[in-house]
Curated annotation (Swiss-Prot):
A GO-annotated cellular component: chloroplast thylakoid membrane
Gene: psbC
Matches recorded under InterPro entries: PS_antenna-like, PS_II_antenna-like_sf, PSII_PsbC, PSII_PsbC_sf
Modified residues (N-acetylthreonine): T15
Name of the protein in its database record: Photosystem II CP43 reaction center protein
Primary residence: plastid
Subunit structure: PSII is composed of 1 copy each of membrane proteins PsbA, PsbB, PsbC, PsbD, PsbE, PsbF, PsbH, PsbI, PsbJ, PsbK, PsbL, PsbM, PsbT, PsbX, PsbY, PsbZ, Psb30/Ycf12, at least 3 peripheral proteins of the oxygen-evolving complex and a large number of cofactors. It forms dimeric complexes.
Free-text function comment from the UniProt entry: One of the components of the core complex of photosystem II (PSII). It binds chlorophyll and helps catalyze the primary light-induced photochemical processes of PSII. PSII is a light-driven water:plastoquinone oxidoreductase, using light energy to abstract electrons from H(2)O, generating O(2) and a proton gradient subsequently used for ATP formation.
Phosphothreonine modifications at: T15
């Protein structure tokens, strides 16, 4: 007899409420958390929580490797990276792999190797994650006391913090070693239009490095985002790596002071909220860095910054009209200010027109034309090189504007223009993720503080309305 319906649809469906889908320590009855509360079920199961974290690391590294190989497979060496929607290859190129003078890609094999290495390590992490989630000990305290912990154990928590800080410090020094000893990194400021070079003369002067932290975040100052030479960036990583490593050792060797024990909440959810806050700050800083900084994120790979594209347009038309006989030093614009050049309130010569708001842009193609008082009129008349004209015309037409449907350029652009800058994607995504992480911080911090104060209720699971409803099956 032909069955009209699959018999399977009459079999009982495992739902949240019939309690039979029980894995020890992972069902609603024993943990107080339903399946959708994710790792909350594992708060007191250090072995299973380790599995979740290792598996998560495996997913992250798998994405990195897979996306890396996807970008390599689609990469066209004749086109700039920023025209191809790439976000991983520009990072590898910035580290000096596979590129030569002017940011030209001469070898894609290092990119392939990077993707394969990430895929292989993701398999190792994936196996470890599955092992610890399904097969390994539920708790580590008994068999591996070094890896065990209790959330309330303040001394153990600061020891774990110290280990993490040391790992971050080692990560910072990996960049330092790459720049110093292992082939160098890409320097967009290298003479003649950018090149890979070893960074030899590090900036270790604390007044310079920490001076960045004391700068105003506003125009012309730009806080740490204003860093514009690699000596400062690599020297900053020496300082940062050293502080992280010494701070990590200090946290391993010491116990929290009394004021810290009183001021902080010591629970798993509190630590989660602190971590989310830190990641949120990182996200916002990364957003500003990739949007404004063309030294750590060279325009050869990521496309021009917004201010850079705007200044490039002013420069391109200055070059054109000067060739046609305009006197760019004295021509007046429709507002009575200089059409091509004007003076800023502090007296230096800057580009006129709407781009005056971006007067503080620094870019390798423009700096040779500056003198002690801003743009130098005699250099603009005599010293403009063809490579500067080509670079600015290219950047003018690749501003980091664009909509979600990939119709790039200004709002009036024709639909045939299919370009969205990686800067737009990276800045927007990091801002949005930073914001979500901040909201998550507020949520978990509020819950952790309420629980510590003793009035955290949550949903009343005994009288939850859904418990009195007919089960789905």
């Amino acid at each position: 007899m032909k069955t009209l319906y699959s018999l399977r649809r009459f079999y009982p469906v495992e739902t949240l409420f019939n309690g039979t889908l029980a894995l020890a320590g992972r069902d609603q009855e024993t943990t107080g958390f339903a399946w959708w509360a994710g790792n909350a079920r594992l708060i007191n199961l250090s072995g299973k929580l380790l599995g979740a974290h290792v598996a998560h690391a495996g997913l992250i590294v798998f994405w990195a490797g897979g996306m890396n190989l996807f970008e390599v497979a689609h990469f066209v060496p004749e086109k700039p990276m920023y025209e191809q929607g790439l976000i991983l290859l520009p990072h590898l190129a910035t580290l000096g792999w596979g590129v030569g003078p002017g940011g030209e890609v001469i070898d894609t094999f290092p990119y392939f190797v990077s993707g394969v290495l990430h895929l292989i390590s993701s398999a190792v992490l994936g196996f470890g994650g599955i092992y610890h989630a399904l097969l390994g000990p539920e708790t580590l305290e008994e068999s591996f006391p070094f890896f065990g912990y209790v959330w309330k154990d303040r001394n153990k928590m600061t020891t774990i913090l110290g280990i993490h800080l040391i790992l971050l410090g080692i990560g910072a020094f990996l960049l330092v070693f790459k720049a110093l000893y292992f082939g160098g990194v890409y320097d967009t400021w290298a003479p003649g239009g950018g090149d890979v070079r070893k960074i030899t003369n590090l900036t270790l002067n604390p007044s310079i490095i920490f001076g960045y932290l004391l700068k105003s975040p506003f125009g012309g100052e730009g806080w740490i985002v204003s860093v514009d030479d690699l000596e400062d960036i690599i020297g900053g990583h020496v300082w940062l790596g050293s502080i992280c490593i010494f701070g990590g050792i200090w946290h391993i060797l010491t116990k929290p002071f009394a004021w810290a024990r009183r001021a902080l909440v010591w629970s798993g959810e509190a630590y989660l909220s602190y971590s989310l806050a830190a990641l949120s700050v990182f996200g916002f800083i990364a957003c500003c860095f990739v949007w404004f900084n063309n030294t750590a994120y060279p325009s050869e790979f990521y496309g021009p910054t917004g201010p850079e594209a705007s200044q490039a347009q002013a420069f391109t038309f200055l070059v054109r009209d000067q060739r046609l006989g305009a006197n760019v030093g004295s021509a007046q614009g429709p507002t009575g200010l200089g059409k091509y050049l004007m003076r800023s309130p502090t007296g230096e010569v800057i580009f006129g027109g709407e781009t005056m708001r971006f007067w503080d842009l620094r870019a390798p193609w423009l700096e040779p034309l500056r003198g002690p008082n801003g743009l130098d009129l005699s250099r603009l008349k005599k010293d403009i090189q063809p490579w500067q004209e080509r670079r600015s015309a290219e950047y003018m037409t690749h501003a980091p504007l664009g909509s979600l449907n990939s119709v790039g350029g200004v709002a009036t652009e024709i639909n045939a223009v299919n370009y969205v800058s990686p800067r737009s994607w990276l800045a927007t995504s990091h801002f949005v993720l930073g914001f979500f992480l901040f909201v998550g911080h507020l949520w978990h911090a509020g819950r952790a503080r309420a629980a510590a104060a003793g009035f955290e209720k949550g949903i009343d699971r005994d009288f939850e309305p859904v418990l009195s409803m007919t089960p789905l099956n």
